[in-house]
Amino acid sequence: GLLETTLGRASRDGRAHLFTVFGEPGVGKSRLVREFCDGLEHVTVLAGRCLPYGQSITYWPVAEMVKTVAGISDSDPVEEAFAKLQACCESEAVADLLGLAAGVLEAVEQVRGQDEIAWAVHAFVEQLAEPQPVVLVFEDIHWAEDPLLDLVEHLADRVRAPLLLLC
């Protein structure tokens, strides 16, 4: 189908592709995405859910993805969570910024700008995509705050690695 073709193009071109699934509530968008992802082999699939307005956790879906890769659980003490994050990042600066974005460390946007967080996520995704293609699934993107939408757009425009952004 179209999703498979788009992922194939991302893999062949070695660059990011953005794919948005539109439809009325209850029409089966989530099921379509889940079935597509379940059928993938030799692809890293990470998913994160955007929270409803008022939750004010801008990068929550990114945090879920980063925690999955690093093997961080919500019960981990901060020191242990950050050690796991550092172990899976090639750069300490990337680990620091992802720690902020993931809420492992305190004070995200006040201390670090959106551009810095975008740079860190970009570097992290390119590192992840070195061995095999990556699919990032942003669930409930209609709840996303502007900085997250800007980040998705940044990744779509600038990542030079086999990446499918699925919203």
Residue ranges and their predicted role:
Residues 1-167:
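Key residue(s) within conserved catalytic/signature motifs
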